[in-house]
Every structure is written in structure tokens, then in C-alpha cells.
Amino acid sequence: MEVIPNINSRRAGLIARIKLIVRGDLTTGNYDPVLAESFSGCIPTRSAFQFSGADGVESAFPVEYVMRMMNDWAKGECNPYIKIQNTGVSVLIEGFFDPPINATKAPLCTDKVNVLLNTTESTGIVLSDINKIKQSIGVDCRPFQACLIVNCFVRLPIVQLAFRFVGPSDPGRTTKLLDSAIAAYDAKIRQRRKRNLQIMESKSQDHTSDGCIPIPIIDETHRSGITGESKSLFGMFKNIASGECVTTIRIPRYIVMLWIFSVLLAMVTWGSYRLYS
């Protein structure tokens, strides 16, 4: 049976995915074991991984791409930081999920994209600063349009760093892929809303089947269709119920006397019948 990967399985093996995009002339150093597993809610507080390059190495490190992978693995609960240091014998690249105390940052701007590191000196870049840098130097901030990389030229005792924004090799194809991803996301949202609406309708039908029948409400259109006679009849019942309507019946006096005499005659006749029987 084929197992469909979920979001947790896609986030697993972060260190392996980072190794796939880092060039082979950079040696993998120590890394936190949790990077080989799915995110468990615990973010490493110290150096998460290390890469190093010996004297004479000329290599490019995808700074922004790696930090965005780290942010995705941690479900956005971090602000990744990449530290680059000249150790005196090599260049050391370290990844942190949050900037450490007194973390140095590269002063990147339009006129300055190169940094020279002497022995024991270091610099770095934070993910949250990348969009600010893009805006300041006029780089396209849309996803997949420009990605920050750093070229390391190790010439001990000096390490030269050159920060560059590189775009896709085929901008048209990248734009189409981005548009299709946005369309797929919108379709997923619409499907989720439709499913929630169906669930709500089924719940309302269940309440109706249990005996909870909604009371119909007469709108103004139906109310206007009531005739004048019906309105007067309703008004009379309303007045009677509220005690506002008092009816007086006038009966002639002779009819009253005749009715009393008939009652007395019936009583005398019934008494005589009982006495002689």
C-alpha cells in the first residue's frame, strides 16, 4: 500500500535537504540530531549545523534558500540567522534558528555587497532583514524572483565574501509555476469552505429530524396580502383578549318578566308532582 506523505514527513530530514543544495567543496560539520526528524516543537537554541571550506575554496552558499527551509521546518516560529566566520584555518558557516546574543550582521547596501573577514572576524545575515535589503537596493521581493547567495573566496589569512541576488534562469517558467501554485492554493481554500458549508447544512438537517422544526416568519410581502376583513377580525380578537372591548346587550323588560315567570311556574309544577306522587 502506497503511503501518502503528509506535511510532517515533508518537513523531516532538514539536514539532508540542506546538504543537497550545498556544493560539495564545503565540508559538512556538526549538526543537531533533531534536524534529521520532523519538527517536534523544540527549536535548537545553539548552532544547528556547520559547513566549512579550507584555504583556496571558492564556493557559493545559498543563504536565503537555506534560511527559508529552516523557517518552513520550524513552522515559522523562528528568525533564522547564518553566521560566517574566518577561523584562521578555514571559513566556517553556521546556521541558527534565532540570532545569538551579540550576533554580527553584514552591512549590505547598494554600494557595499562585499565583506572582508580577517582572522577570527565574523559576519552574518538574518532572514527578516533580507526583504528590507531587497527593497533598499531595488530587488524584486516576490517569491522565487531573487534569492540571496554568498560567494566565499578563502585566501587565508583573509576570507572575502560577495553577497549577490540571483534570479531564476527562466523567469517566464518561474512565473507560471508561481501562478499555478497560487491557483492551487485558492482552489484548496474554496474546497475547504464548501466542505464546511456542507457540514453546517447536514447539522441543521439533523436538528430538523429530531423534532426541532423552524418557525416560519411572515415577511412584509405576505402581510400586505391580508384582506381588510381579516384585519378587522384580528383587531376584534385582539381587543377582546386585551380587555379593551366591552359588549352591552339590551333586552326588553317584558321578556325578562316572562322568563322569570316561566322559571317559577316550572318550579311549582315540579314540586307539586313530587308531593302527590
Swiss-Prot record:
Main location: host cell
Transmembrane stretches, start-end: 251-271
Post-translational modification: Phosphorylated.
UniProt KW Transmembrane helix keyword: yes
Nuclear side: 272-277
One Pfam family linked to the record: Herpes_U34
Perinuclear space compartment residues: 1-250
Subcellular localization: Host nucleus inner membrane
Gene Ontology cellular component list: host cell nuclear inner membrane; membrane
Record's keyword terms, sorted: Host membrane, Host nucleus, Late protein, Membrane, Phosphoprotein, Transmembrane, Transmembrane helix
Membrane topology classification: Single-pass membrane protein
Family listed: Belongs to the herpesviridae NEC2 protein family.
HAMAP family: HSV_NEC2
Subunit organization: Forms a heterohexameric complex with NEC1.
Function: Plays an essential role in virion nuclear egress, the first step of virion release from infected cell. Within the host nucleus, NEC1 interacts with the newly formed capsid through the vertexes and directs it to the inner nuclear membrane by associating with NEC2. Induces the budding of the capsid at the inner nuclear membrane as well as its envelopment into the perinuclear space.
UniProt name for this protein: Nuclear egress protein 2
Biological source species: Gallid herpesvirus 2 (strain Chicken/Md5/ATCC VR-987) (GaHV-2)
Lineage of producing organism: Viruses, Duplodnaviria, Heunggongvirae, Peploviricota, Herviviricetes
